[in-house]
Amino acid sequence: MRASGILMPISSLPSPYGIGTMGQQARQFVDFLSQAGQAYWQILPICPTSYGDSPYQSFSTYAGNPYFIDLDTLAAQGLLKPKEYKHIDWQCTPEQINYGALYEKRYAVLRTACERLLASPPADYRDFVRKNRFWLPDYALFMALKDAHGGACWQEWEHPLRQREPDALKAARRTYAKDIAFWQAVQYLFYTQWQALKAYANDKHIQIIGDLPIYIALDSVDVWSSPQDFQLDADLNPTEVAGCPPDGFSATGQLWGNPLYDWDAMAQNGYAWWVRRIRHMCSTYDVVRIDHFRGFAGYYAIPYGNKTAEGGRWRTGPGYALFAAIKKKLGEPRIIAEDLGFLTEDVNALLRKCGYPGMKVLEFGFDSRDGGDYRPHGYPTNSIAYVGTHDNEPVNGWMATAAPEDVARAVRYLNLTKQEGYHWGMMRGIWASAAELSIVQAQDLLGLGHEARMNTPSTLGGNWCWRA
C-alpha cells in the first residue's frame, strides 16, 4: 500500500524551551499526522550534537540528544520544580535555535533532575544500564573525561587515556564516578521519553523513520573505544578521511573529515560493530534511513590533513558482504538507502541485491545538468519520493534560487500555478508517482522559503537551527 509522511526534525518542533523536545508538542505533532492520514514521521539523527551543531557529527552513534529531553515531563515526575527552569531565557527566536545558550544552560537543569533521579533510582534504571552496557559505560566515561579536559578532543588527552590503558581507565572511573553517573542518568531520561513517544506514535499507526549517518565523528566515543575498526595510524590519527570528490556542484568537493572504516578488520569478526549498530537502530526506530549508501560500494578517501577534497581516491567498500552479515543476524531490517550523489553501476547493483528502496528527490529532476532520473513519471515502486530533503531548499526557496530554466522546466512539467501554490504543485508531483512512500518537508507544508532551510552542505554556521 502506498503511503505518505512528513519530515520534521525533533529539534524543529515548537517549544518554549529553546528547542523541540519529546513532550507535549511532539505528541501533538503525532496527532496531526494521524488526523492528516499520514503513516510516517521522518526525523533527523537523534544523537547528541557537538561542534557545528550537526546531528551527523556526534560524540556517539548510540546516545540520545539531551536537549530533546522534555523538562515539563521531568517536572511531572517530580524530578524538577517549575521554578528551576521556567524562568530561563534560552536566547532564541521562534524561528531559530540558539545552541550556545542550550549548551550553557540546559545541562545545569538536567544535573538537578539527575541528582533527584539517582537519589532514588526507578525500578528499571539498573536494567536500562545493564541492557545498554555495550555502549553506555564507555559513553558516560568519555563525556566525563571530555568535561574534565575542557571539551578537548580525546586525541589531546594524556597518552594513557588516549590509548585506553586499563589502569588509567580504572582510575578515571573512580575519579569521575559522579559525572559518569550523571551521563548515564541523562541517557535513561532520554530513552524513557523516546520509547514513550515512539509507543504513542505507533498506537496512532504512525511509524518513525530514523536517520543513520554512515560515518562516525573522529571526536567520538565510538572511535576512541574501537580504534581497531577505523583506518588510524599508530598515533591514532586517521590515515585518510571521508568526503566527496569535486563535481559540477562543488569545484573542490566536500571534505567531511570523518575517519574511514577498516573494512578488512571488520570483516574478520563478521562486521560485528555494524551488526550491533543496526540492531540498536532497528530497536529505536521503525524504519532506518542509511545516509550515503554509495559508500558501501565504493568510498572516496582523502589524505588526512588536506584542506579540500581534491586529491582523494576511490576505494572499494565492503559491498554485499556487510549486508549479508546484517541479514544473517537480524533478518530483514527495514532500511531506506540514501542513494543520492555520484552513482556508478556497482552502487546500483548493490542496491538491487539488497532489495532496499532508494530515494528520488524531485528538485533534482529539473536540473539542466542531469535530472532525468528524478522526474516522477519514472519513479519505481520500490523507492521513496521526496520533494527535497533536509539538505535541499524548501520549494519556495528553490523557486527563488534555482536557475530560471530549471524553474521553468518544473512549471511546465507539473503545470505549476500560483493559484495552487508552487509548493503544493511540487508535493502533488511526488504524491502522484508510483513510489511506495512519499515524504515532504514540514517547511513545504507551511509554504516557507529559504529562511527555513535546514542545512546547506559544505557551509558552516546557520545550519540545523530552523524551528516551526
Tell what function each PLM region has.
Residues 44, 207-209, 213, 287, ...:
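Outer-envelope exported proteins of Gram-negative bacteria
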Residues 1-11, 27:
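N-terminal regions that are enriched for targeting/export leaders
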